């Protein structure tokens, strides 16, 4: 299985994804991710704009999914913006 950490950016079928699963969980062939898109309608706090590799991309939080690790290729990290990602997941789950 590919080594991925929380807030890593990985490519999956041509789409950039942020891994949001805790590293404290036991290894699994699947991992929870959220797509990073450049043309997604942003809702305040739910869809923060993140910078990756000189691009400004929207975290499409409602499109949260699980994908097979084997299909992911790590291309970077947004760990420095991890608070925005965590807040977005909190808003998705709790509404606040």
PLM feature spans:
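Compact nucleic-acid interaction/catalytic patches
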Residues: 3-49
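C-terminal terminal-subdomain/extension
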Residues: 52-96
